[in-house]
Regions:
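Active-site bordering "gate/hinge" segments
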Residues: 1-324, 329-332, 426-428, 442, ...
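Dual-mode signal for accessory low-complexity, basic/Gly-rich regions
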Residues: 239, 275-493
């Protein structure tokens, strides 16, 4: 939260900006004052290898003049600089009109005067650096107790973020938000048998305070992670050039959801406004309401109100309140991820609130919200626990964690790896594998899911490093999901 004096100064600047934008005859305008604090600690083996704790702040002004966008930003938060940036944004909008084919139009949004703060129990920045460093070194020391068996490297990390944002618009909104985010994990590498293999564990990135850094949980997983790294380095390589049944844990499935459902349903990517980082999308608007994206028992739901979700906020960067909606309902593509501009082009009456900028100096763009796979209903014909899926599989592979991945320029064809792999035979896990990859066409993959986990196995996995745009912007989101079983998937090759 801003101090009272700082908030008043910022509100005065925001009022000045909005008045200037209105006086210039713009159809719309907004301003964001943002302050970001980021703290990261990394430990490598027996030493703290990386420590940053920095803060940056500034403001960005966006105007829509005669159907064209203009944007300007600065770190100097003074009346003189603000006036200069508003005028610059207006001049840029005038220049943009010279090469613009179609004018920008926006769906309406109500005016909001509100405050949102991430509910936390412990401010992560109140914990001494020494305590955090000692936790990481303790983790590494315990991992390296397996050095004689073959563990050669240990790495651990902690990441904390605080974002303060004040948003004002010509619609009449004045919204102040404070977002907290926490993340931790570790990795060890076994070297033996002429090979090197790693295993990882993380407390997933979530919008929580230091209470998310559960030391008991982190320390209790060390023995398992080290032993699995050692087993993995001696394990046989996975099969290649065959089809197999896959059982995917949420720790692996979330990235598949991210790449094959999240990005293809970003409406700016569908329209071709955005084509960096794996291109546009096959899920075009002429297929809305008809495309059999997944099996009829599959539902993908967006929810920016999800407690602790990595993209959970009160409002997006256009002042649109957070909400929830389906993008795939009973297997059918039913909606997209939109901001006010793309929603208007689609013919919708309102935005889904997906506009986000990663900095005061960045333009908002459509970003994936919390997007998850709904659990199977109790008693559903395709609902099964992870244990039941394994017991019901004659031959297959169980995958945990994420590895390498790639996807084509329309998000049709993908390949994913993982971090841990186990061979299943006659309903039992018979040992680890290594170097397994699976690949499929997006709609084939999701239509071949024949079992999904119940709500009791729902996990909030996700990413804090989703890149999009040029210049690059980074966003974060949760892909809460359950285990699934998928039939006849290509392995390796």
């Amino acid at each position: 939260m801003l101090t009272t004096s700082t908030r008043q100064k910022t509100c005065d600047l925001a009022t000045l900006a909005i008045d200037l934008i209105d006086q210039a005859g713009c159809e719309y305008g907004d301003i964001r004052f943002c302050t970001y604090r980021n703290q990261t600690l990394h430990a490598h083996d027996h030493s703290l290898s990386h420590l940053t704790d920095h803060q940056k702040s500034g403001f960005g002004v966006r105007v829509l003049l005669k159907g064209a966008w203009g944007f300007a930003a600065s770190y100097r938060q003074t009346p003189e600089e603000l006036i200069r940036m508003v005028n610059l944004a207006i001049e840029i909008a005038k220049g943009s009109r010279l090469c613009q084919q179609n004018p920008v139009r926006l769906v309406p949004v109500k005016a909001y005067q509100d405050t949102y703060i991430t509910p936390i129990k412990i401010d992560p920045f109140s914990i001494p650096i020494s305590e955090k460093a000692n936790l990481l070194l303790t983790i590494n020391d315990r991992l390296l107790q397996y050095q004689e068996q073959g563990i050669r490297k240990a790495n651990s990390y902690l990441q904390f973020n605080q974002e303060n944002k004040l948003f004002a618009s010509t619609e009449g909104s004045l919204i102040e938000q404070t977002i907290y985010r926490s993340y931790s994990g570790y990795r060890c590498t076994a070297v033996a048998n002429g090979d090197a293999q790693s295993r990882s564990y993380e407390r997933p990135p979530l919008n929580l305070g230091y209470e998310h850094i559960d030391q008991t949980d982190l320390l209790s997983q060390i023995e398992r992670v080290a032993e699995e790294a050692l087993e993995k380095v001696y394990a046989p390589k996975g099969p290649s050039g065959i089809q197999s049944t896959l059982i995917l844990k949420p720790t692996n499935l979330y990235l598949t959801i991210h790449e094959s459902v999240g990005h293809p349903t970003e409406l700016d990517r569908v329209y071709g406004y955005e084509s960096n980082f794996a291109g546009t999308s096959f899920a075009t608007t002429d297929q809305l309401g008809t495309l059999q994206y997944a099996a009829p028992w599959i539902n993908f739901k967006c929810d920016r109100t999800q407690p602790a979700g990595r993209s959970t906020i009160g409002y997006d960067d256009e002042g649109v309140p957070s909400q929830e909606w389906y993008v795939v309902k009973e297997g059918i593509l039913v909606d997209y991820l939109t901001d006010r501009e793309t929603a208007y082009r689609l013919g919708k009456s309102s935005s889904k609130g997906c506009a986000f900028a990663d900095s005061w100096s960045s333009l908002p763009m459509v970003r994936i919200p919390n997007l998850g796979l709904e659990p199977g209903p109790i008693g559903g014909s395709h609902t099964a626990t992870l244990a039941e899926m394994i017991a019901d599989t004659k031959e297959g592979i169980l995958i945990d964690g994420i590895g390498s991945f790639s996807i084509d320029q329309q998000r049709r064809n993908f390949q994913f790896g993982g971090d841990g792999f186990w061979q299943i035979k006659n309903g039992k896990i018979v040992g680890m594998l290594k170097d397994v990859t699976y690949h499929a066409m997006t709609t084939d993959f999701w239509n071949q899911v024949d079992a999904i986990g119940p709500a009791s196995e729902w996990q909030q996995c996700g990413t804090n490093m989703c890149g999009k745009g040029e210049p690059l912007q980074i966003a974060q989101m949760t892909h809460a999901c359950v285990p699934v079983r998928v039939q006849n998937i290509n392995i390796g090759g």
